[in-house]
Curated annotation (Swiss-Prot):
Residue ranges that the Swiss-Prot or TrEMBL entry lists as coiled coil: none
Gene name of this polypeptide: GSM1
DNA-binding region: 20-48
GO cellular component entries: nucleus
Organism placement in taxonomy: Eukaryota, Fungi, Dikarya, Ascomycota, Saccharomycotina
The protein's role, per its UniProt record: Transcription factor which regulates nonfermentable carbon utilization. Binds specifically to 5'-CGGN(8)CGG-3' and 5'-CGGN(9)CGG-3' sequences in the promoter region.
InterPro entries (UniProt xref): ERT1_acuK_gluconeogen_tf (IPR050335), PAS_13 (IPR056751), Zn2-C6_fun-type_DNA-bd_sf (IPR036864), Zn2Cys6_DnaBD (IPR001138)
Record protein name field: Glucose starvation modulator protein 1
Length: 618
């Protein structure tokens, strides 16, 4: 049996309300004195002080306050007419008895009714309330109900917003479709009896039946989260995965624009005017400008959140320096494209004049010869102006395909000459269409988050990889090699390539020259289709991609993709054939290998081409 303690010892061991910090830490008995006996024994009496406890969060009791008349008010947070998530949403409703509505009286009890409904269910009207699953009171009772349609809609209904549950809005996963859907929603009339107080967007449950039938297909795949960061990440991931649905015009849209501008197909495709392709290429831009202007007037009534969700694009100051010059030179070049053959050369001269930061590859290599020189002279590395590069590329392609068709009059038969011009125009359309449909959507998705420092790092990575490739070409006797950027600008040419083609080194590296200038029309068309579809960003299923590329190949004889090309397992190289231009004006048939070099963002920065001549025996 435990010995009973004396009363003095019991009083000493009696627990106190607040212990000191030392006794609280050591879990020993403290006394009311300060300093306490434990601290005095250990000579730490000057540090003895009460332990501060965290204040408890006490639940405030509801006082007797008169209930305010809530009136006929329906508050709903992001509740669409049709939703796609299988989650559940909980509604909480406060019912007031008849005696509680009078001011000055305390309510007997509070009643909470919890509604649970499947988001896949469709609302028939704005006043419809989902099925009641349980009935909770303060006494702990639970009553199951079957329906709540007989409850008056005039009572206050509060939606408990769950930030995890996605809600549906009139938006799609890409920028242009998102704005077009918003513009379409603004044009649709909304019933006045369906206007409710919302936090973000109007509820579509009160639309006409015709409007609901039109939106059934759109709402099935349009998911919008309450968090703008989560929604932005979802859109970018969806764009990267779903690369088969670009937001730019597809084949049918381009040909529909062509038919709308040229009702007569023969007059549009076989006419003598070369402005047909220029108008066709600019038609998409004009239509988009008209839509953007109309959308800009209507989107002012939308919430400011819509502006935050808009897809970011890379916009640097150096890219805007050439805006005025390009705006002045472009219309004059398009107007004189057919009559003056020297208009493209004037345009190139104007672009070179305004490109003050341009350093030719030969001059840059004189300054930077080793990797250490690259980092010592890092100030010399500037952001490459790809906007200006693609402008020059478009001018080069127009000159090669359109003006080449006008100058080449060696055909003996007029019909044969007309067919040749038609095929060259069609080849240029195929090239531009492959860029818009295959390359541009994925490129925009990958670069939407890049900043100016990322672009500078990309240029440093390009120059560092270029040094390694040049050293490889100089150390060993390799096949004729040429290295160019993703825009086609030549960066390096090996000595074997000079010996094979007969061109001068200064002609290729002292100015902005493109690899497409030294390939024939068929090789250029094949390169763009293979690069945009397979080589630029890689591929998963080789056979599937190859079959898709064959099916998408045009029926033109000059632009039909050759069947003799193969791939590497890592998806970074393609083996095919091409016709290489020589200094005497003739073309040499070569077997070539195109190898791509990508950066950490999986964006192509360099393409290395190796050419091996094929000599046919008679």
């Amino acid at each position: 049996m435990t010995k009973k303690l004396p009363s003095e010892l019991k009083q000493t061991r009696k627990s106190i309300q607040t212990a000191c910090e030392f006794c609280h830490t050591k879990h020993i008995q403290c006394d009311v004195g300060r300093p306490c006996q434990n601290c005095l024994k250990r000579n730490i009496g000057k540090f003895c002080r009460d332990k501060k406890r965290k204040s408890r969060k006490r639940i405030e009791k509801h006082g007797t306050q008169p209930y305010l008349n809530l009136g006929k008010r329906l508050v709903i947070h992001d509740v669409p007419s049709k939703t796609v998530s299988p989650s559940s949403v909980h509604l909480q409703r406060d019912f007031l008895s008849s005696d509680q509505e009078k001011p000055g009286k305390t309510p007997a009890h509070n009643t909470n009714i919890q509604y649970t409904y499947n988001i896949n269910d469709n609302f028939q009207s704005a006043g419809s309330i989902p099925r009641i699953t349980n009935f909770n009171t303060n006494n702990g009772q639970t009553v199951l109900e079957n329906t709540s349609n007989n409850i008056s809609a005039s009572q206050a209904v509060h939606l408990m917003n769950d930030p995890i549950i996605p809600t549906v809005r009139k938006s799609t996963l890409n920028l242009k479709s998102h704005f077009l859907e918003q513009h379409k929603a603004m044009q649709q009339p909304l019933a006045t009896n369906c206007l409710v107080a919302t936090s973000n967007v109007p509820v579509h449950s009160g639309m006409d039946d015709s409007n609901k039938s039109d939106d059934d297909v759109d709402d099935e795949t349009n998911i919008h989260f309450d968090s703008m960061w989560c929604n932005d990440e979802y859109m970018k991931l969806k764009d990267i995965v779903d690369i088969s649905t670009p937001f730019l015009p597809n084949n049918s849209q381009i040909f529909s624009l062509q038919e709308s501008e040229y009702p007569n197909p023969s007059a549009s495709t076989r006419g003598n005017s070369s402005l047909h392709l220029t108008n066709l290429l600019n038609s998409t831009k004009s239509v988009n400008d008209q839509k953007d202007s109309s959308i800009g007037h209507s989107t002012s009534t939308f919430n400011t959140y819509d502006e935050v969700v808009s897809r970011p694009f890379i916009s640097l100051d150096m890219l805007h320096l050439n805006r005025g010059a390009n705006a002045n030179t472009q219309p004059s070049h398009n107007a004189k494209l057919e009559s003056e053959c020297d208009s493209s050369s004037h345009s190139d001269a104007d672009l070179e004049k305004h490109d003050t930061d341009f350093i030719s590859p030969s001059k840059f290599r004189e300054l930077v010869k080793t990797p250490q020189d690259l980092y010592d002279n890092k100030c010399l590395i500037k952001l490459h102006n790809y906007k200006l590069a693609y402008t020059k590329l478009l001018t080069t392609l127009r000159k090669k395909f359109l003006e080449g068709a006008e100058i080449d009059k060696s055909a003996s038969v007029k019909d044969e000459h007309s067919t040749q011009k038609h095929n060259l125009r069609y080849d240029l359309e195929v090239i531009i269409r492959s860029i818009l449909e295959r390359y541009a959507p994925i490129f925009i998705s990958l670069t939407s988050n890049m900043i100016e420092e990322d672009l500078l790092l990309q240029e440093v990575t390009l120059q560092r990889a270029l040094l390694d490739l040049e050293n490889m070409a100089k150390l060993v006797s390799c096949t004729p090699m040429c290295i160019w950027r993703r825009s086609g600008e030549i960066c390096f040419v090996s000595n074997e390539f000079y010996s094979l083609t007969g061109f001068n080194k200064n002609l290729l590296l002292d100015r902005t020259s493109f690899i497409f200038e030294y390939l024939d029309h068929k090789s250029v068309s094949n390169y763009f289709q293979i690069f945009n579809e397979l080589l630029a960003f890689g591929y998963n299923d080789i056979n599937k991609r190859k079959k898709l590329l064959m099916l998408n190949a045009c029926s033109s004889t000059s632009s039909k993709i050759t069947e003799g090309f193969s791939f590497t397992t890592d998806g970074k190289a393609i083996f095919t054939k091409c016709n290489l231009l020589l200094s005497n004006g003739l073309y040499l048939k070569c077997a070539c290998c195109w190898t791509v070099k990508r950066d950490s963002f999986n964006i192509p920065i360099l393409v290395m081409g190796q050419f091996l001549p094929i000599f046919e025996m008679d």
